Design a protein with these regions (language model features):
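Short linear motifs embedded in intrinsically disordered, charge-biased segments
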Residues: 1-187
């Protein structure tokens, strides 16, 4: 889980050595060995897709519900499943584009917009009264950053954000994207 070139650490509890895994799930979020977000994004898209599928017949394909009600359910259920834990994600632009593609596909489907209608994404978002995914990610990160900045000194999230726990060497080559860098980009 570090960027060091050394092997993974060995952890022993009561004379039992724990196995080192490539990835694990903690609080419904996937943590990988290389700290990339690809598997987490795939899992979030999968969860949001299953939520959307379960609600399709009753909500999104129901002609008796207003568009406002459908979009409220979409934001409350599907976007919540999609963006769960996104406050601490360090996503690259290709991953943001993947999330935005999923979001726009669902918005245009809920609004019953066909590709032959020649409606732009901005117009579809305006009709749905929902922001683009980049804005949603930025809002969540900034809200979390404000929460962390108000924490007392010595709290682990605050120390991590302000690089007060950094020790060791970094790997050669381009450094991985950090949450601090993403937060600076947002402000």
């Amino acid at each position: 889980m570090s960027q060091d070139t050394e092997g993974p650490p060995t952890i022993t509890i009561n004379n039992y050595q724990l196995d080192v895994g490539k990835e694990f799930t903690y609080l419904s979020s996937t943590v990988t060995e290389n700290l990339f977000m690809d598997s987490e994004i795939s899992r979030r898209i999968g969860r949001a897709t299953s939520t959307l599928a379960r609600l399709s017949k009753r909500v999104f394909d129901n002609d008796k519900l207003t568009m406002n009600t459908k979009m409220t359910v979409y934001r409350a259920c599907v976007l919540s499943a999609l963006l769960y834990g996104s406050e601490s994600w360090t996503v690259y632009s290709r991953q943001e584009r993947r999330l935005n593609t999923f979001h726009m596909r669902n918005v245009t489907r809920i609004l019953s917009i066909k590709w032959s209608d020649h409606i732009t994404n901005n117009e579809a978002l305006r009709r749905a009264a929902t922001p683009i995914i980049y804005t949603l990610l930025r809002q969540r990160r900034l809200r979390w950053q404000g929460h962390v900045c108000r924490m007392q000194d010595g709290r682990i999230p605050r120390d991590l954000l302000h690089d007060e726990l950094t020790t060791g060497k970094t790997a050669q080559g381009r450094p991985q994207l950090r949450l601090k860098t993403v937060c600076k980009r947002d402000t």
